[in-house]
């Protein structure tokens, strides 16, 4: 079965691409490589072939400065409080999820995610490609 990115992941990536056309994409990704294959990861396809994670390169401006990703990661975190398509976010050694009320807390995984922001999605995002209401990527929230 050919892997496919969940609709919510496709939509979020499209909004980022539309609003930051000159951004660096070298740390972007969605489909797990050999490092992901040996362990559970939302980058690995499930039984239906659906992948529920994206990585967005930190360099949104294409010039490294200004560093906008901390602000975008925080806006995604705020949106996730009401948008049930987002499962969790990892960025700059911190993770946010519903477990702790979407507050940032220390992330102790292997990769601190300093070069990209990781967003994982719930099964609700599999078929839901509705617009993310996030100010830095076209929303008005």
Regions from the language model: what does each represent?
Residues 104-111:
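Short proline/glycine-enriched turn/loop segments at secondary-structure junctions
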Residues 3, 123-141:
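Low-complexity, Gly/Ser/Thr/Pro-rich intrinsically disordered linker/tail segments
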């Amino acid at each position: 079965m050919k892997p496919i990115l969940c609709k919510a992941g496709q939509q979020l990536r499209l909004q980022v691409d539309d609003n930051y056309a000159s951004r660096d994409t070298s740390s972007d990704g969605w489909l797990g490589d050999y490092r992901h294959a040996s362990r559970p990861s939302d980058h690995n396809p499930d039984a239906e072939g659906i992948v529920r994670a994206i990585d967005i390169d930190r360099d949104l401006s294409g010039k490294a400065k200004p560093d906008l990703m901390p602000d975008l990661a925080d806006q995604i975190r705020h949106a996730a409080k009401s948008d049930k398509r987002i499962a969790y976010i990892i960025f700059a050694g911190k993770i946010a999820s519903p477990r702790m009320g979407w507050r940032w807390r220390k992330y102790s995984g292997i990769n601190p995610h300093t070069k990209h922001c990781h967003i994982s999605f719930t099964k609700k995002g599999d078929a839901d490609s509705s617009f993310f209401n996030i100010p830095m990527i076209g929303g008005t929230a």
